[in-house]
C-alpha cells in the first residue's frame, strides 16, 4: 500500500485548501501567488518607504564614523534575469535587498562585522569558520563597507542578487502539485518505483501539516501518538509525534524510558528544518515492523519529534513575511515584536549587546525563558523527567543553513563539556553517515567556535563563532537537562539559496538526516547495535551509486587525524577534514 499518498490525500480532503495560503485575510490556495495578475493575494501589509530613514541613517554614519560621502553611490549588484517576476507586494516588502558573503580571516574581521551589523541593524543569516552571510539593502552596502576595515571591503561577494525574486520563487508553485514519479521515496520502506511522496514534494503550511500529523498518528496508533508540548504565545499547540512501542502508557511496566527528542522550526524561516523533522518522523513511523533497524530503535527508545517549536512564527512566514525569524510575542516595543527562541533558554542567558534590543533578530527576551514557546517546552521536558519516568539521552535541534554539526557549548569556548570526546566521536559518525548519503559534507565543531583555513595551511587558532551566544536550546538540554548527546544540525545548503532552499532539496535533506538518525541510534545502542545490518538500511539519493562501506570513511578519518597531528607538530602536513576543538 502506498501509505504516504493516501495519508496526504485524506489530510488535504479534510483540510480547507484555503487555509494553506499566505494571507489570513484573503484566503486562497498558494497557487494564487504565482502570477502577476494575482499579486494581491501575496503576503501584504502596510509598507512605508525606507528612503527617509535611510538618508537619515546614512547622514549619521557619515558624520560619526567619517564614511566618505563619495562612497554612497548605489550598489552595482545586478539581478539575474528571470521569466517570472516578483509582484509589487513582494517588492514592497523586500525592496532591493541582497545577501552578501564576507570571507573572514581573523577574529578582528568577525568583531568588525558584529559591530557594523549592530550599528546598521543588519540581519546576519549564517556564519562558519570561513565566511559570514549578511542581508541588507543595496543602498546600505556603502554604509556597511565604510564601517569595515580594508581587509573586508574587498572580501565580499553577492550570494543572492535579488532577495525579493528569490522569496517569490520559494513559495509553492502550481507545478509542485504534480508529483514526479522519479522522486525518491521513503528511506525506510522499499516501495515500487512509481511511489510518490506527495507530501514531501513541497513545503507545507501548518494548516496542512497538522491534519497530516493527526492522520498519521491515527493510522499507526500502536506505536505513535500525537502530543502537545504546550501552547504558543498566540495559542497554537506545539505539536509533536511520540513514537515508541508504548507511547500511550506513561505508567508502563518496562521501567524508565530513554527518550530522544528531535526539533525543528525554532527559527520560523528555516522551512527545511520543519520538513526534515516530518520526513524523519514518517520514516520511523512507517518503518516499524518492516525495517529491522527502525524496529530495534523504536523498541529500545522513545522518540519525540517536534516539527516546529515556533508555530506562530512559522504561520507568519506563510501569511506575511517569508524571512521572519523570531516568535510573535509582544514586547516593550510594539513595532518590534518577537523573541529569538534560540537565545532565550535559561542556561547562561545573555541579554547584552544586540540581544537586548527588541528590534534585533537575536533579541533574547527580557530574561531567561522570556520566549513563551521555550518556556513551555522546558516545562514539558522537566515534567517528563520528574513525573513520567523519562530520561532524555539525545537531542537533535535542526536549523539551517551552512551544513554544520555543532556540539556544546554555544555560550563560551572557555568551559569544556565533560563528555567532549564522546560528543566529538558521535558528531564525526553523523557527518560520515551524511556523507555516505550523497557526498554532502557537514563540518563538525563546537557551537562556540570554528577554525580559519586559507588554502591548505592552517592559519591561526580557533575563532569564536559569530553566532555563538548564551541561552541556546543546545546548551540547556545538555547542561540543565543532562542530555548526554546534544547537537545542533545546520542543514542544507552552504549559501547558494540560504533559507530559501528549493523544494527539490526536501527529500535529499530528509535522507541525510534519516541516515544521521540511524547513526545516532546505532551509537546509543552500543553493544546491541551489531545485531542489525545497518548498511542495509542506509539510503543514498542516487540509487545507482553503491553505498560505501562505513569503514572506508573511518579509515579516511584516521588518516586525516594523523595528518593533523603532524600539522600541529611541524606545520607542514595538510588535512582536508579535521575536527579542531579548543580544550583550554
Curated annotation (Swiss-Prot):
Pfam families: Peptidase_M14. One of its GO terms (molecular function) is zinc ion binding. Zn(2+) binds at residues 267, 270, 399. Residues 564-584 are annotated as: Disordered. Glycans are attached at residues 383, 389. Binds 1 zinc ion per subunit. Residues 202-524 form the Peptidase M14 domain. One of its GO terms (cellular component) is extracellular region. Residues 21-174 form a propeptide. Keywords: Cell wall biogenesis/degradation, Disulfide bond, Glycoprotein, Metal-binding, Secreted, Signal, Vacuole, Zinc. The keyword Signal applies. Substrate binds at residues 267-270, 325, 342-343, 400-401. Gene3D superfamilies: Zn peptidases (3.40.630.10). Its cofactor is Zn(2+). It comes from the Eukaryota. It is found in: Vacuole; Secreted. Disulfide bonds join 336-359. GO terms for biological process: cell wall organization; proteolysis. Residues 1-20 form the signal peptide. InterPro entries: Peptidase_M14. The keyword Cytoplasm does not apply. Inactive carboxypeptidase that may play a role in cell wall organization and biogenesis. Belongs to the peptidase M14 family. This is Inactive metallocarboxypeptidase ECM14. It comes from Uncinocarpus reesii (strain UAMH 1704).
Amino acid at each position: 500500500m502506498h501509505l504516504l499518498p493516501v495519508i496526504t490525500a485524506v489530510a488535504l480532503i479534510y483540510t480547507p485548501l484555503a487555509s494553506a495560503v499566505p494571507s489570513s485575510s484573503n484566503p486562497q490556495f498558494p497557487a494564487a501567488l504565482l502570477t502577476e495578475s494575482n499579486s494581491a493575494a501575496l503576503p501584504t501589509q502596510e509598507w512605508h518607504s525606507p528612503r527617509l530613514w535611510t538618508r537619515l541613517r546614512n547622514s549619521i554614519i557619515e558624520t560619526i564614523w567619517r564614511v566618505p560621502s563619495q562612497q554612497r553611490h548605489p550598489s552595482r549588484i545586478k539581478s539575474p534575469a528571470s521569466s517570472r517576476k516578483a509582484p509589487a507586494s513582494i517588492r514592497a516588502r523586500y525592496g532591493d535587498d541582497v545577501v552578501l558573503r564576507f570571507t573572514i580571516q581573523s577574529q578582528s574581521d568577525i568583531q568588525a562585522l558584529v559591530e557594523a551589523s549592530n550599528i546598521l541593524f543588519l540581519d546576519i543569516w549564517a556564519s562558519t569558520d570561513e565566511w559570514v552571510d549578511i542581508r541588507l539593502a543595496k543602498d546600505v552596502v556603502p554604509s556597511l563597507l565604510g564601517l569595515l576595515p580594508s581587509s573586508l571591503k574587498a572580501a565580499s561577494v553577492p550570494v543572492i542578487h535579488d532577495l525579493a525574486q528569490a522569496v517569490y520563487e520559494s513559495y509553492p508553485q502550481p507545478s509542485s502539485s504534480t508529483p514526479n514519479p522519479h522522486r525518491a521515496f521513503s528511506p525506510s520502506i522499499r516501495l515500487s518505483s512509481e511511489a510518490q511522496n506527495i507530501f514531501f514534494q513541497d513545503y507545507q503550511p501548518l494548516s496542512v501539516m497538522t491534519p497530516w500529523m493527526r492522520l498519521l498518528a491515527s493510522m499507526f496508533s500502536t506505536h505513535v501518538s500525537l502530543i502537545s508540548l504546550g501552547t504558543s504565545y498566540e495559542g497554537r499547540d506545539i505539536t509533536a509525534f511520540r513514537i515508541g512501542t508504548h507511547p500511550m502508557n506513561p505508567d508502563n511496566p518496562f521501567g524508565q524510558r530513554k527518550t530522544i527528542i528531535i526539533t525543528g522550526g525554532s527559527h520560523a524561516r528555516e522551512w527545511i528544518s520543519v520538513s526534515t523533522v516530518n520526513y524523519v518522523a514518517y520514516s520511523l513511523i512507517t518503518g516499524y515492523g518492516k525495517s529491522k533497524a527502525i524496529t530495534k530503535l523504536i523498541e529500545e527508545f522513545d522518540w519525540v519529534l517536534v516539527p516546529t517549536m515556533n508555530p506562530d512564527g512559522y504561520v507568519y512566514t506563510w501569511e506575511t513575511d517569508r524571512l521572519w525569524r523570531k516568535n510573535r510575542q509582544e514586547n516593550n516595543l510594539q513595532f518590534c515584536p518577537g523573541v529569538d527562541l534560540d537565545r532565550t533558554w535559561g542556561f547562561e542567558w545573555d541579554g547584552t549587546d544586540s540581544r537586548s534590543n527588541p528590534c534585533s533578530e537575536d533579541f533574547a527576551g527580557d530574561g531567561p525563558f522570556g520566549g513563551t514557546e521555550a518556556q513551555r517546552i522546558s516545562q514539558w521536558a522537566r515534567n517528563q523527567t520528574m513525573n513520567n519516568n523519562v530520561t532524555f539521552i539525545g537531542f537533535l535541534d535542526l536549523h539551517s543553513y551552512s551544513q554544520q554539526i555543532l556540539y556544546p557549548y554555544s555560550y563560551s569556548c572557555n568551559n569544556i563539556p565533560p563528555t567532549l570526546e564522546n560528543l566529538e566521536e558521535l558528531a564525526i559518525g553523523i557527518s560520515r553517515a551524511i556523507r555516505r548519503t550523497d557526498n554532502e559534507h557537514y563540518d563538525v565543531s563546537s557551537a562556540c567556535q570554528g577554525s580559519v583555513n586559507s588554502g591548505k595551511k592552517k592559519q591561526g587558532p580557533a575563532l569564536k563563532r559569530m553566532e555563538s551566544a548564551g541561552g541556546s536550546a543546545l546548551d540547556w538540554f545538555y547542561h540543565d537537562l543532562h542530555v548526554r548527546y546534544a547537537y545542533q544540525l545546520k542543514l542544507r545548503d552552504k549559501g547558494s539559496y540560504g533559507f530559501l532552499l528549493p523544494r527539490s532539496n526536501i527529500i535529499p535533506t530528509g535522507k541525510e538526516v534519516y541516515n544521521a538518525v540511524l547513526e545516532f541510534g546505532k551509537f546509543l545502542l552500543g553493544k546491541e547495535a551489531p545485531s542489525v545490518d545497518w548498511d542495509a538500511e542506509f539510503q543514498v539519493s542516487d540509487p545507482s551509486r553503491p553505498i560505501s562501506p562505513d569503514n572506508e570513511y573511518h579509515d579516511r578519518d584516521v588518516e586525516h587525524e594523523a595528518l593533523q597531528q603532524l600539522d600541529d607538530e611541524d606545520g607542514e602536513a595538510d588535512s582536508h577534514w579535521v575536527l579542531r576543538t579548543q580544550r583550554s
